[in-house]
Amino acid sequence: MSILVVIILAQTAEPRAGMSVASIAATQVQAPPEGFAHSAIKARWEKDERGVTSGQRTWMWGPGPFRTAYEPFDGLLQGNHLVQYFDKGRLEINDPSGDAQSSWFVTSGLLVNEMVTGKIQVGSNRTFHIGPARVSVVGDDPRGVPTYAEFLLPTRSERTVDLTGKTIGCWFGERFVQPKEVDRPLVRYEQVSGHNWAEPFWNFATGTLKDQWLQILGYPIAEPCGVKTIIGGKSQYVLVQLFERRVLTYNPANPSATQVEMGNVGRHYYNWRYADMHEADLDTKYNAQIQIGPAPRRTTTVQQTVQFTNTTGSNLSNAVLRTVWKRWDGVFTLKSAIVNGEAARTRWLHGINLELTTSKPVPAGAQVSIALIFELQPRPVGGRTGYDKSNDILGLGDMLPTLVPWENGGWSFYPYSDLGDLGYYAASDYSVEIASTGSEKLVVGGTGGIPTVDVNGARWRFNATGVRDVAYVVSPRFINPLADASMTRQVGSVKMLAYFLPEHKSDGQRQLQLTAPAMAWFSNEIGPYPFESYTVAEMGVPLERTDNYAQEYPTAYFIPSSWLRLGTAPGTWTWYTPVHEVAHQWFYSTVGNNQLTDPWLDEALATYVTAEYVRANFPDLYPASWSSMTNGATNVRPVSAGVFSGFANENQYSATIYDSGALMLDRIRRAMGDTSFYAALRDYYKTYQGKRATTDSLLAIFHRHSKADLKPIIVQYIGY
């Protein structure tokens, strides 16, 4: 999405006062934490961390959240819960409608228990098994240090006897002989879990945490053990004990106030859970028959089917489809929902996610067939969707209910956000038919290959393979590029089509002139464009409106009619925005990413390769263009932050995700050199084509191709 173009790039080419590109790079040492996604989480963090500022102890959570997500959990009101990850743990809100003043409104997950057992809790009575975490529980060097997985051994996980008053024993075998440096007595036997407390940890629990110890730590799930590890570059003996929610360490070499510390459980858990998304390949296929009513309302009726295979590994009783048009009152009306021949129970989760539940669970490996009938009353055009009555253009972006991904044992869905893009989906196959309810001849452009059209021009058919969603623009006034070759371009095997009003014909031809060379350059430098066609279309929006922006979709790019009056003078943002949108066909359309939690992976990359296109092909325009693209860069959040990470507004979001993200990529390229950098991009594109990448996916490929140490750059912009 090119919201940054409207908000950031329309400013002067000079950096903002006091915020030049050079000063940012020189003064920023480490990326700041993410913002707080809920005031109650912030209040809990502030309360718990008061002792840090006074020097009484070290962090209980960490300097701030580093990741925000909505994770699936059966039985909750919305079907999932808001979580924020910190270095030392995770805070979560299970019932946003509950008593925010309750000490249990914000809770801490049983992260250690899950890492030891290898089972992610995705419901009160349901877990998803991904295998115990083979991550060292403490220290900077994993050699000789037990992992969470090793605590699953029967000799460690089984209940022990009451050893109060005894010397600490270790249950890992000879290589973990208890060192005298951390030899402390056992002072309490926990009847609930069947394990003994080491003296330093019980004193910390009752003296520092007081009546909060159970809420923060949980019960001990293993006996305390002494290990030798590397901390701060030095070999040290520390005492370690695992609890349901936390890991505690005791280091006698530290000052007394910091001898007992929390382990980095939040980081360990996040890396374990999200190292592999465990996304089920559902082989989803969509079919939609869309009937467009007459002007001036353009009421639209849709019959849609969704078919997929239950590859989740267990019986499936529900499905969740993100339904963006439900966001606006009176726009989306569901008439019927059938699952495998049975009328489904419906529920709206976070307002826009349609949950369909059946009384007959679908066995693993079986087919699921969903049939929907719904009506749309298009709103006045705004942003990426709606009806422009003055130009008679109907924008149908994000209009089909779309199956959300199944990841880590549950459906992955989120609330609506005004920031960024509206959802993320697995690559699927679509067959879409669009027609008028009468005999009106429509012209339709959008996602899919080159459309087929009935002789009378009233019915358009699109087939799209391996796309993440679909979008269309409809008008009886469009020039039909299938009948007017001047509204097409050929780039290798790719046919480019332009859908514009007659009075904007030259603008449509200019858009093709701008985008065709970019299509060729990206194909050569990054990897081949994988589809047979690409569509550029105007999507209405009266000329006096300013709350609009260009929008990418698979195999398509829509530009507001209101932008056309601005021209496309070389070097201006209206000149390179079309290139930015073409770049999204590589980053978003082909290589997918969660645009709600990892938006920089498509927006920063699209911004940066656009700049690289200008640098390579228009070197005289590059300095001013690059300055304009990055002049809003800010360090208020990490580049890898998501839309729920506490951004104050769209300006701040764009300045971080687009501008700072592009700056980081530029520093990485300079450190690696052009040859290695582009080899990494080609590797990334080839590896994740048709799949979904993560921040760690891209960073791992950069590290693999780089001879230079990239860590200082990444720490500065991302934080790790």
Say what each PLM segment does:
Residues I373-F478:
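Extended, low-hydrophobicity, Ser/Thr/Pro/Gly-biased non-transmembrane segments
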Residues T299-K326:
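Ligand-binding face of N-terminal immunoglobulin V-set domains in extracellular IgSF glycoproteins
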Residues P599, E603-M672, Y688, H705, ...:
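Acidic/His/Gly-enriched intrinsically disordered linker/tail segments
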Residues R327-D392:
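A surface-exposed beta-strand-loop module
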Residues A371, V432, I479-Q585, S589-D598, ...:
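Juxtacatalytic substrate-recognition/specificity segment
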Residues V21-H278:
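Extended, compositionally biased repeat/scaffold regions that form elongated interaction surfaces
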Residues Q304-T311, P361, D421, S428-V444, ...:
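Zn2+-dependent metallopeptidase catalytic core
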Residues M277-T301:
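N-terminal, polar/Ser/Thr-rich
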